[in-house]
């Protein structure tokens, strides 16, 4: 999916781990470990993004304009190093919404085919 800097078009299907990373950043900026923990929590442990995969994705997502590095919160205390914090960009929000809408259409299609019930 590497097309070049800021060439991402919302509506283009995202890799699953990109979608989960954007969801993790949708409500707050986070550092790498915080993103990993949020993805694990929001998926009930069914999706795990490994550190190498995360940082490669963050690099590519930054190049595409979906996320950007940002300052650590003022109250953030480190145990030594200086973790990088990331936030979702307006383009990232649009891409995340488009992907969520795409997933919703797939769920609706599965319900129409009686693969899924309407009530969870």
Where are these regions (language model features)?
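Amphipathic alpha-helical dimerization/coiled-coil segments
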Residues: 2-3, 91-120
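A short, glycine- and basic residue-enriched loop/turn
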Residues: 32-33, 46, 70-74, 83-85
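Basic amphipathic alpha-helical segments that dock to polyanions
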Residues: 54-61
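A detector for short, charged/polar N-terminal pre-domain segments
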Residues: 1-15
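Beta-hairpin "wing" of winged helix-turn-helix
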Residues: 62-79, 87
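N-terminal helix-turn-helix DNA-binding core of bacterial DNA-binding proteins
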Residues: 11-53
């Amino acid at each position: 999916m590497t097309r070049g800097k800021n060439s991402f078009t919302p509506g283009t299907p995202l890799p699953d781990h990109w979608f989960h990373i954007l969801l993790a950043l949708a409500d707050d900026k986070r550092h790498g470990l915080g993103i990993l923990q949020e993805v694990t929590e929001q998926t009930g442990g069914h999706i795990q993004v490994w550190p190498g995969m995360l940082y490669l994705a963050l690099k590519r997502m930054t190049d595409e304009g979906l996320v950007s590095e940002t300052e650590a919160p003022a109250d953030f205390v480190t145990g030594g190093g200086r973790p990088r914090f990331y936030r979702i960009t307006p383009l990232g929000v649009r891409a995340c919404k488009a992907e969520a809408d795409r997933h919703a259409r797939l769920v609706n299609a599965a319900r129409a085919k009686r693969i899924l019930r309407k009530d969870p």
